[in-house]
Amino acid sequence: MSYSQDLSQLHNPRLEDLIRIAYNNLPSDKRTHPWIGLSHGVKLLENNNELMQYLCAYGKMHKEKIVSALDAIREPRNSFSKKVTIIDWGCGQGLASICFLDYVRELGIVPNIEKVVLIEPSVPAINRANEHLCKYIGEDQILLVNKYINDVANDDIATNSNLVLHFFSNILDI
C-alpha cells in the first residue's frame, strides 16, 4: 500500500499513527537516517519520499514543541472550547495543527474549529497537510494558501473568530 492508502484506513488518527505509516512506507535505506537530504528540515519538500522522511525525522520534535507551548496555557478547556481559527504558517504537512487537535482530544475537549488556514509554498507538502487535516476536521473547514509568507494577503487569513491561533512551528522554511 501507499502512504495515502494507509492514511485512508485510519479512523481518529494521532500524529504517532502518521509517523508509523510514513516509516512503514519509507524505502528501507531511508529508515535509519531519514533526515539525510532534508537540509536539517528546512528544504522545501518536493515528493512523497521526502514528506515521509520529514515526518519520521522531525514529527516527534514538532509534537514536543507544540505540546510544550500548549501546556503553558491556563484553563485550556475554557479557551479551546470556543470557536477558533487556526492559521498554520509554513505548515508543511500540517503537523502543528495536527498536534493541537491531538492535544485537545487528549484533554477531552471537542474544539469548535471555524477553519484551519494552511500556508505553505510546497505543493506536495500543502496537499499532504490537507490530506492529514481532512482526517481530523471537515474539508470545508480547511483553506489552502499555497504561497510564501511575503505573498500572503490579509484576505488569505481573514476570519470572524474571536480566538485565532497562529502556529509558526516551521516559519524558517518560508
Predicted regions span which residues?
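A short SAM/SAH-binding and catalytic strip from SAM-dependent methyltransferases
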Residues: N162-I174
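Conserved SAM/SAH-binding beta-strand->alpha-helix loop
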Residues: S122
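Conserved class I S-adenosyl-L-methionine
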Residues: K83-G92
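Short beta-strand element of Class I
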Residues: E114-V117
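N-terminal auxiliary segments of SAM/dcSAM-dependent transferases
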Residues: M1-G37
